[in-house]
A protein has these predicted regions:
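Beta-strand-enriched accessory nucleic-acid recognition/scaffold domains that flank the catalytic cores
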Residues: 1, 5-10
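Short loop/turn segments at strand-loop or loop-helix junctions that form parts
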Residues: 59-78, 113-122, 158-166
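Histidine-anchored nucleotide/phosphate-binding helix
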Residues: 86-107
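Extended alpha-helical coiled-coil/bundle linker/stalk regions that scaffold oligomerization
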Residues: 258-259
Length: 261
């Protein structure tokens, strides 16, 4: 990270602090935390906007970190196979847990919220690939929720997208239709679909719906980002090309440099 970028971020945070009643000493402390977080994020492109948004979120007395987690899809060698759906500890939760524990070491006042992606069960094509009904999907997600509660630190909160953000699934479907129809997004969707093609083929999505599925993923990231930015929170996410949609939403986020596909 170039030194001039850090200087510009610090000046921006100092201005934010002056206008929002943040004591000057907290700016220096936040800058130290930002450097620590950057060292944890792996090889992602980190710019001034990313750092500024994250710094502003860290000024909160109790920063909320929302952690979206896929259901307990089958996996092998640390990568999802999507052969079936189980009701135990999800792979992504297991990969996020050590990252979050490290984050808490220098952010002891942070509030961790695990968000199980129960809304993914609303995709008929995904349920068909997993050979499960909607009822079974939801039941297994609840089983995973209980398993995480038993496994994680007691002060972490474990919930689902539907519980935390009522109406999230419907809103995401509506946004997906808008994104899919917008000409300005066509090239971006095509590029993201190309990156995700191996994943789609693993699930069994026909090529004719792959771009549409990418629009739905983009909408989920946008909708989550907009919800979290409203509470000045932070999102913790795995490595994925879809992180760019968080930038569109204006939300602060950190990348746990793990791959699951």
């Amino acid at each position: 990270m170039r030194r001039d970028v850090w200087k510009r971020v610090q000046r921006g945070l100092e201005q934010y602090a002056r206008t929002n009643g943040v004591i000057p000493q907290q700016v220096n402390a936040t800058m130290r935390v930002l450097r620590r977080i950057v060292s944890m994020c792996g090889s992602m492109v980190i710019g001034r906007r990313f750092l500024y948004r994250l710094g502003c979120a860290l000024f909160e007395r109790t920063p909320y970190v929302f952690v979206p987690v896929c259901p307990d899809y089958s996996y092998e060698d640390g990568k999802y196979t999507y052969k079936d759906l189980r009701n135990g500890l999800p792979l992504l939760y297991l990969k996020h847990k050590p990252f979050l524990l490290e984050l808490e070491q220098f952010l002891p006042n942070v509030k961790i919220i695990i968000l199980l992606a129960d809304h993914e069960g609303d995709l008929p094509e995904l349920r068909a690939a997993l050979n499960v009904s909607l009822e079974t999907f939801r039941t297994n997600v609840e089983g995973s929720k209980d398993a995480i509660v038993d496994d994680c630190p007691a002060h972490w909160r474990v919930t689902t997208f539907s519980e935390q953000f009522p109406g999230f699934s419907q809103h995401a479907f509506e946004r997906a239709n808008e994104i899919f129809r917008e000409k300005k997004y066509q090239r971006r969707l095509a590029q993201d679909t190309s990156v995700r093609r191996e994943l789609y083929e693993k699930i069994g999505y026909h090529h004719s719906i792959q771009c549409e599925r990418t629009a739905h993923v983009a909408a989920q990231y946008l909708c989550l980002g907009e919800q979290v930015v409203n509470v000045h929170g932070i999102i913790c996410n795995h490595m994925t090309t879809s992180l760019s949609w968080y930038m569109d939403a204006g939300v602060a986020f950190v990348q746990n440099p793990v791959k699951i596909y």
